[in-house]
């Protein structure tokens, strides 16, 4: 029998060494013990996989950009090599996402009781995130399917968070941040993205006095990110309008 505390300790150690694949493997084993995760364990799992998938997302973006430039050059051999490499990274990224999604469906979301609102929203947000990462690299019907799954998870989490959590709660704010990014980047719906982000920001500002001391830093940081995105997106929309002569 694997010792749970040893696995968690290993994950902490791997995080300090920035060995995120090891960290993810340890937290995957903890999750598969099929017992609820503590807040710390939940965060360890999230940080581990965020770094594992983040490295692949970053590599994929770099190679995709090189692929576009190479296509313009017309060097067939090089084009084929770059495409094959992009597909290799894509497969790795998809495998990581499927790993997380199966942990969420088979253990984490499934085992949330009615009273574990915070955990349920956290895991549904995570589900939306990992389907969003799949949507970044998918095309055609496959993309449509993962986009729909992402929207469904975000939407469910959003409804629960609005009903049961303070507008200043960092998990509710983090969900609004990522859900609005989904609308902007994946759905190409800037108006919906801005509306969601602005509502979350305004609601939190209106209830600043409910800010929990423990989560003050997290909440205010996410509020800042929401505001930064709003500034960027509204200026982008104005630029687009300007280009179309709609000033």
Curated annotation (Swiss-Prot):
Residues the record marks as site: Interaction with phosphoserine on interacting protein: 57, 132
Modified residues (N-acetylmethionine): 1
The keyword Iron is assigned to this record: no
Transmembrane segments: none
Gene3D superfamilies in the cross-refs: 14-3-3 domain (1.20.190.20)
Any Gene Ontology biological process: positive regulation of cell-cell adhesion
Modification Phosphothreonine occurs at: 145, 234
PTM sites of type Phosphoserine: 71, 215, 235
Positions carrying N-acetylvaline: 2
Renumbered residue ranges of the record's region Interaction with SPATA18/MIEAP: 2-247
Keyword Acetylation part of the UniProt annotation: yes
Residues bearing PTM Phosphotyrosine: 133
Places the protein is found: Cytoplasm, Cytosol; Mitochondrion matrix
GO CC, any one term: mitochondrial matrix
Keywords of the record: Acetylation, Cytoplasm, Mitochondrion, Phosphoprotein
CDD domains in the cross-refs: 14-3-3_gamma
Quaternary structure and partners: Homodimer. Part of a complex that contains DSG3, PKP1, YAP1 and YWHAG; the complex is required for localization of DSG3 and YAP1 to the cell membrane in keratinocytes. Interacts with SAMSN1. Interacts with RAF1, SSH1 and CRTC2/TORC2. Interacts with ABL1 (phosphorylated form); the interaction retains it in the cytoplasm. Interacts with GAB2. Interacts with MDM4 (phosphorylated); negatively regulates MDM4 activity toward TP53. Interacts with PKA-phosphorylated AANAT and SIRT2. Interacts with the 'Thr-369' phosphorylated form of DAPK2. Interacts with PI4KB, TBC1D22A and TBC1D22B.
Family: Belongs to the 14-3-3 family.
Role, per record: Adapter protein implicated in the regulation of a large spectrum of both general and specialized signaling pathways. Binds to a large number of partners, usually by recognition of a phosphoserine or phosphothreonine motif. Binding generally results in the modulation of the activity of the binding partner. Promotes inactivation of WDR24 component of the GATOR2 complex by binding to phosphorylated WDR24. Participates in the positive regulation of NMDA glutamate receptor activity by promoting the L-glutamate secretion through interaction with BEST1.
Name listed for the protein in its UniProt record: 14-3-3 protein gamma
Organism name: Bos taurus
Origin organism lineage: Eukaryota, Metazoa, Chordata, Craniata, Vertebrata
Gene that produces this protein: YWHAG
